């Protein structure tokens, strides 16, 4: 009989990472996030979550566990936002994770972040990622830390999304962890938008669509399937875009209003969800992807319901999430490793 491992989840968001863990051999026994907008969705789909600033939570209030996970805020490191990095107060929240790990001494630590964390520097010029590894290694008894930049589409997520995953085993367990090998080829047809957007009638959240801005409503109908802003006639472009079109070399040939075709794999679903920069236009309909469509691109199952009054906040929580399918593959590899060592 397979053992189930107890997980404490920090910075849980709407529950993408936690869903993947529960689909494997893990139970979430305690979770936390400060963002009010994610609470209802998390509780509806995963379970109870403590809505509180992690800096105000005493470690005595957190149960002992086998695993601690944390998707500490990625915006300060993200290339999709302004890269304030370690100077942004949110960039220091990983130290709160270290505080909890030090007190609870779980067998395994799982961190997740955007690839920008690989190049983010501390104020003294050293790399933040080296600091994180050093802090984990020098706890008592300390952790053997592995991290890798993973492509989500290598593991069955229908999206070209890169994420840095840390997996650290407590040193006294003497475990040499290896990340799972890819499960899907890059040309797997099941990953294309045509397959993902084939949604049965009456699936929850399919009718929830964030309306386009007046400017986008004017421009989007000109864009062909698989096209971009280059399909838009020069005469109807806003003045700002005309200046860019006039000097593409100077502006490094940006791609605005990308509309992927049904035969392509989606680009990265981001928290911003702006059609101009984020490639979230439906292949054939003049609108953003619906909430359900971006959820499917993120590999959330159809029965995972997103709740909230604000559509922009729902798009944001999905864009910030770890794809559950990627999380499950990582979880399975960790469970297998623990059980091979009779832990």
Where are these regions (language model features)?
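Class I S-adenosyl-L-methionine
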Residues: 57-65, 79-255
